[in-house]
Amino acid sequence: YYKYSTLRQEEKRMDSSTLPQGCCKETLQMKRLLYRLVNFAQPSNALSVGCPTSAHLYLAAAKQGMNFWHASSLDELFLDADEPVDFLYLHDVNNPGLLRQAFALCAERTTPQSLFVVQGIGYSPSMRQFWQELKGDSHVMVTFDLFDFGLLFFDPAKQRQHYKVSF
């Protein structure tokens, strides 16, 4: 994870005025976790839905050659036909409706190796409800509740299981 120092420098150079106000910002620990998760999953295609944040630097840097897209709204969410979604990061706690719709679009395009990450699953009653809906989705096999983040795995060979982990 030798890119951490380079990523920190790039993050400091980012103009904070270009990032929207009112969005939940990820901690350094969370950004590094996202980096490690992309590194673990080795996705060909990764998608981020929500407010633009500096976490995108970490997501995009974790795997060279990966296709990485960001969408702030459904209007910006363009997926090619039959293109799988290997990694999805949902992170707009103020708009669970957007996250719900993005999940519905992307859940049909998962592979057994797909990994979805949801930020702010404990942020509000509506986000807690959204997390419960995700855990009950028929595509989802294994979940990890990390309090701030939720991880969703889709491998049908796995036994359906939900874990709660202190992170």
Task: Go through each PLM region and give its residues.
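A short alpha-helical cap/connector motif
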Residues: 1-112, 122-167
